[in-house]
């Protein structure tokens, strides 16, 4: 329902929020969607490699036919609704490029807060220091990094690109029968480092090549410096 409403609103306003390409040349994949899939796969690879050293555990989700079907419907509908909404907010807010960094920051925080259950907000009160620190390191910081990256992908390529990244991670989380059983510190590091590296890789890939073999970065005011600073501090 959310996806339908957002898509209709975008159509009425003449905004393409599903699939576009702001960069003229890509060196990682052929378009933002393929780049997002590759970065998502890279993050999963890091988790699997870490799992080899720290162990694996069984998935907590149901793998009965009914359970799988229910989860597919739930994950797919939620993912499409969230990413279409993300792309719509980014597209609407990025009409004025002077406010682009602020818009991406606001949208990121909004979706991070949306991802946290009401009971988890009690950790942010710091009544018990260690669980609060663990929650921030294990959940908040990776969510911040991944949502920042998803917003950046939505800015470059629309909802389809963001779905390519977030959908890859969701598919692994929900439909893999075994999952890496990682210490919260390792999980936090991977969840923050992978999107940060993905951001750097994409920043270096969207360049224009001139006839004189001189490369010029794609000229657009994006939150590169702010994003990199936040990601570095998070790591």
For every predicted segment, state its role:
Residues 40-49, 107-119, 166-178, 235:
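Aromatic-anchored segments of alpha-helical transmembrane domains
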Residues 219-235:
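Internal/C-terminal transmembrane anchor helices
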Residues 1-3, 31-46, 104-111, 229-234:
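Alpha-helical transmembrane segments
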Residues 8-28, 85-95, 205-218:
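Cytoplasmic membrane-interface regions of multi-pass membrane proteins
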Residues 62-121, 135-149:
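Function-critical hydrophobic alpha-helical transmembrane segments in multi-pass membrane proteins
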Residues 2-33, 52-64:
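Membrane-helix interface linkers and caps
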Residues 138-206:
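Functionally important transmembrane alpha-helices
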Residues 2-13, 74-87, 146-151, 191-207:
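Hydrophobic cores of alpha-helical transmembrane segments in multi-pass inner/ER membrane proteins
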């Amino acid at each position: 329902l959310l996806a339908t409403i957002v898509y209709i609103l975008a159509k009425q306003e003449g905004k393409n929020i599903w699939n576009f390409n702001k960069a003229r040349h890509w060196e990682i994949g052929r378009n933002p969607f393929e780049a997002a899939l590759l970065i998502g796969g890279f993050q999963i690879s890091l988790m699997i490699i870490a799992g080899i050293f720290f162990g694996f555990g069984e998935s907590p989700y149901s793998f009965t036919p009914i359970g799988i079907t229910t989860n597919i419907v739930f994950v797919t509908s939620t993912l499409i609704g969230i990413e279409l909404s993300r792309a719509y907010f980014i597209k609407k807010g990025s009409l004025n490029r002077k406010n682009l960094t602020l818009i991406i920051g606001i949208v990121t925080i909004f979706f991070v807060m949306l991802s946290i259950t009401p009971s988890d907000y009690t950790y942010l009160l710091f009544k018990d220091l260690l669980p609060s620190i663990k929650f921030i390191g294990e959940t908040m910081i990776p969510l911040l990094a991944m949502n920042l990256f998803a917003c950046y992908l939505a800015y470059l390529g629309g909802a389809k690109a963001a779905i390519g990244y977030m959908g890859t991670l969701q598919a692994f989380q929900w439909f893999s029968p075994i999952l890496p059983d990682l210490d919260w510190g390792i999980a936090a590091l991977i969840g923050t480092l992978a999107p940060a590296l993905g951001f750097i890789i994409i920043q270096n890939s969207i360049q224009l090549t001139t006839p004189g073999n001189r490369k010029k970065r794609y000229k657009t005011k994006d939150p590169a410096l702010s994003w990199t600073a936040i990601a570095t501090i998070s790591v």
